[in-house]
């Protein structure tokens, strides 16, 4: 395992019970990379993510995780759907502070970590706003801030643009791009939207029929398998 590798899958099959959802996966995520994991619903994106996060054991092959990432505090995760109840009156500050629970951030540095997370997500000055008074895009940025306040080495986002209008999607993706460039944060964006990977990521994992084609963006998207998969209205590759 290379010194800058965070996750390495070699010949991995993953699934539930004895039925594999993914077969013979080879994929390596390294520090500072921006990954787009693309595929339709049910293609295995979340299954592989669960494997990397230690929530699912492989049926075959080897799955290695950098020792420092076995401490969950080093991984920030933004789920596809917020688990918050709309009956819970939570301010932006209270929501973001939830990310500090069981984190490795020293108590003496938590105020600075909170300010940094709010600043990076464009939420400075909104700390006292009720989460449910925010727009969809602002609420999604608050969830990103909750993950960032832990000072993670890796940020994983599951369908972060789902349900947002185009302008709000673009603003959120610009925020993520700035985090990748300026904070050198490693990103994995799980999505079914081809354009996110094509325009934003530098590495792509394409989930097709139980297999994964993974590597540098242009190599993967120029492959015959990718071109066959994305033929059709609005999906054609350049």
Regions found by a protein language model. Name each.
Residues 204-216:
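H-loop (His-switch) and adjacent beta-strand-loop-beta switch element
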Residues 155-158:
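Catalytic Walker B motif of ABC-type/P-loop ATPase nucleotide-binding domains
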Residues 130-134:
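Conserved ABC ATPase signature
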Residues 109-126:
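Conserved ABC ATPase "signature" region
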């Amino acid at each position: 395992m290379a010194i800058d590798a965070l996750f390495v899958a070699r010949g991995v099959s993953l699934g539930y019970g004895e039925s594999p959802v993914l077969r013979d996966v080879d994929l390596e995520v390294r520090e500072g990379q921006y990954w787009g994991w693309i595929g339709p619903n049910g293609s295995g994106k979340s299954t592989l993510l669960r494997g990397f996060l230690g929530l699912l054991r492989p049926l075959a092959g080897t799955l290695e995780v950098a020792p420092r990432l076995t401490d969950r505090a080093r991984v920030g995760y933004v789920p596809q759907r917020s688990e918050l109840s709309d009956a819970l009156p939570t301010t932006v500050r209270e929501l973001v502070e939830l990310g500090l629970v069981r984190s490795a951030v020293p108590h003496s540095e938590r105020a600075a970590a909170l300010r940094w997370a709010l600043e990076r997500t464009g939420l400075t000055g909104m700390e006292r706003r009720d989460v449910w008074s925010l727009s969809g895009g602002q609420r999604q940025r608050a969830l990103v801030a909750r993950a960032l306040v832990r000072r993670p080495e890796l940020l994983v986002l599951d369908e972060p643009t789902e349900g947002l209008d185009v302008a709000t999607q673009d603003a959120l993706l610009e925020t993520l791009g700035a985090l990748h460039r300026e904070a050198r944060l490693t990103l994995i964006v799980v999505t079914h939207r081809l354009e996110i990977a094509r325009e934003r990521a530098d590495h792509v994992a394409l989930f097709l029929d139980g297999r994964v084609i993974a590597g540098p963006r242009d190599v993967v998207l120029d492959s015959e398998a990718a071109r066959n998969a994305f033929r059709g209205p609005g999906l054609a590759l350049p």
